Structures are given as structure tokens and as C-alpha cells.
């Protein structure tokens, strides 16, 4: 293999395409109308319509019905799995501890433990709710909900 030098670097064969030079004479194949065809709105300079415009026909985004909504409180609640509690070092866990450990996002105000995974160590939850299955798993491991 030869020495690579800055003045000998070249792009890979076929990786670069020559720029289309339009309107440069008949022989170029893109002269006169420059590949725009004859007449019509799209052949004119500045002759383009806005995205979604369908020539006056009711556009698709207005023909389709509105659907659903975005709940305003969706970022306030978070679900936590017992396996995530298992990885935390603290024995007493509240929402602030979950935020500090990166288990839930910073905008979360309320957390709920769901039954998904196993818990084998004692944890005390403060200000955190749990489903019936999760509560049973926490209490079986010697923990509690305060």
C-alpha cells in the first residue's frame, strides 16, 4: 500500500456526481427550457405552489377528520418497575430519589410501581403508589409503602 498524503486524496470512484448545468445550449441536452418542459406554472421563475396545495381541491389534511388529543398532564406521571427499584442503592425511595437516579424524568410529579419483574430486597416507598401485584411483591420482599 502506498503512502497516503493530503495532496493525493480523492473521493471513491462513482461517489461524486457532476452538478447539472442547465440552460447552457442545445448540445448539453438541458438547454433552452432547462429540463422544465414547455409552459405551465412549474416552467416559470417563482412558479411553485405551497406544500400540500392541490390546485384548489380541498387538501388531504383538511379532508381527513381531526382525531384524538394530547393530555396536558401526560408528563406528570411515570410507571416504575420493581427491577428498577432493585438497582437503586437507597432503601427509602421517593419521587426525588427516582429523579436523582435517572429512573424517571425531571418533570414527573407522581410515580406508580407496576408488577413487572422481581424484587428481592427490602425497599420503603414514600409518596409512591403501587398496583396490587406490585404491593404484594414489595411486602413479600420485606418492604412497605408509606
UniProtKB/Swiss-Prot annotation:
State a GO cellular component annotated for this protein.
Answer: cytosolic large ribosomal subunit
Segment Disordered: which positions? 1-65
Can you tell which superkingdom this protein's organism belongs to?
A: Bacteria
In its UniProt record, which GO terms are filed under biological process?
Answer: translation
* Keyword Cell wall biogenesis/degradation assigned: no
The record's annotation in HAMAP family points to: Ribosomal_uL15
Described by its record, this protein's role is as follows: Binds to the 23S rRNA.
The UniProt entry's sequence similarity note says: Belongs to the universal ribosomal protein uL15 family.
Protein name (database record): Large ribosomal subunit protein uL15
Source species of the chain? Bordetella parapertussis (strain 12822 / ATCC BAA-587 / NCTC 13253)
Q: By which gene is this protein encoded?
A: rplO
